[in-house]
């Protein structure tokens, strides 16, 4: 009897152990099934948020592993790099000497140390049809909340990959700064200690955005590229206004939505967009904070040209109460002559004004 009872107890204990083991195996299996999906989804989200150039290729579309790829001019490239034995030994020795936690940070340190030599290299050439190969990599929000701009096509002709403005093709931060517009694009820097992309001038960028918003309310500019080119050219114009003691203020207003006509002032013959006007006059109190004063290049004895209407030039002298009006060219789009030729063309414009008065 005792032997039979012992056998039954052993059988029951064994069954309980088997049930517990099966239950534990089922729980582990369920956790293993749920964990990869959540981890992979979170990794995909964070990777897409940090860098839009990181791409994950599914196994159904030819992907061979779970590691993500990066988009380059030669296509998708693996993030893992196989090193030779001597190179790997030197890399790990350098990691220990620098006190870095990851071998990849050694590569970041080497790239930063060689940034001057990298800047001297010729730029990469984009292959034909590069934007058609990866249409889903067009710059949208990409985690930074920025909208695409017309400077993308001008920075990278033939492509619409605006994310390349934020993520340089292996270049240093100095090269990346030349490719981007510093007033609208957030500059990023790689933190070697944390290994993350951080925003190191978010406050200054917000100040730039606030200035652009207030400026566009006073001087509407439909094309953001015209805003950049106009101020760039006005800087050259202001340098030439140093021949007289009269104060002249330079401003822009009413630039029309014609994206094909850019405002250029320093070339020999340039055109302004439809409805664009340039104002040169004494500095009002409200404008003194936005535009500094510069000496006028027009003397007190000269007639100051005022051209109103669509696409005309207006010059106001601080010594004259009234200004004569003259059309430089008929039509919606006018050609503005170089400003260093205005002094020599006074006789021609006066003769043209007398002809217009006789015709009227």
From Swiss-Prot:
Segments forming domain TCP: 63-121
Record GO cellular component, one term: nucleus
UniProt key word Nucleus: yes
Expression sites by tissue: Expressed in cotyledons, particularly in the vascular region, in leaves, buds, flowers and immature siliques.
Keywords: Coiled coil, Developmental protein, DNA-binding, Nucleus, Transcription, Transcription regulation
GO terms under biological process: leaf development; leaf morphogenesis; leaf senescence; regulation of DNA-templated transcription; response to heat
UniProt-annotated location(s): Nucleus
GO molecular-function term, one example from the UniProt record: DNA binding
PANTHER family tied to this protein: TRANSCRIPTION FACTOR TCP4-RELATED (PTHR31072), TRANSCRIPTION FACTOR TCP5 (PTHR31072:SF168)
Protein name: Transcription factor TCP5
Naturally occurring in which organism (per UniProt): Arabidopsis thaliana
Gene: TCP5
């Amino acid at each position: 009897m005792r032997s039979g009872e012992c056998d039954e107890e052993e059988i029951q204990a064994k069954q309980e152990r088997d049930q517990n083991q099966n239950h534990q195996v089922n729980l582990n299996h369920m956790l293993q099934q749920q964990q990869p999906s959540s981890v992979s989804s979170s990794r995909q989200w964070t990777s897409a948020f940090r860098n839009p150039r990181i791409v994950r290729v599914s196994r159904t579309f030819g992907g061979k592993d779970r590691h993500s790829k990066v988009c380059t001019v030669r296509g998708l490239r693996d993030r893992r790099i196989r090193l030779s034995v001597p190179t790997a030994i030197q890399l790990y020795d350098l990691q220990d000497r620098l006190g870095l936690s990851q071998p990849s940070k050694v590569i970041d340190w080497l790239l930063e140390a060689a940034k001057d030599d990298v800047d001297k290299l010729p730029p990469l050439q984009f292959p034909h049809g590069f934007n058609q190969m990866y249409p889903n990599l067009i710059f949208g929000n990409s985690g930074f909340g920025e909208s695409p701009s017309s400077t993308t096509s001008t920075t990278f002709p033939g492509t619409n990959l605006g994310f390349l403005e934020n993520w340089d093709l292996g270049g240093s931060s100095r090269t990346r700064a030349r490719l981007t517009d510093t007033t609208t694009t957030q500059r990023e820097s790689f933190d070697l200690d944390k290994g993350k992309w951080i925003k190191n001038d978010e406050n200054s960028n917000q100040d730039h955005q606030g200035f652009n918003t207030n400026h566009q309310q006073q001087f509407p500019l439909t094309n953001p590229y015209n805003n950049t080119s106009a101020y760039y050219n006005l800087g050259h114009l202001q340098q030439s206004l140093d021949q007289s003691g009269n104060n002249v203020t330079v401003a822009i207003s009413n630039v029309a939505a014609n994206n094909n006509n850019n405002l250029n002032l320093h070339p020999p013959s340039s055109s302004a967009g439809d409805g664009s006007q340039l104002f040169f006059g004494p500095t009002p109190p409200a404008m003194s904070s936005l535009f500094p004063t510069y000496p006028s290049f027009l003397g007190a004895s000269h007639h100051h040209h005022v051209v109103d209407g669509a696409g005309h030039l207006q010059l106001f002298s601080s010594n004259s109460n009234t200004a004569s009006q003259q059309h430089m060219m008929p039509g919606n789009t006018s050609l503005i002559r170089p400003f260093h030729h205005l002094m020599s063309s006074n006789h021609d414009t006066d003769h043209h004004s007398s002809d217009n008065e006789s015709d009227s």
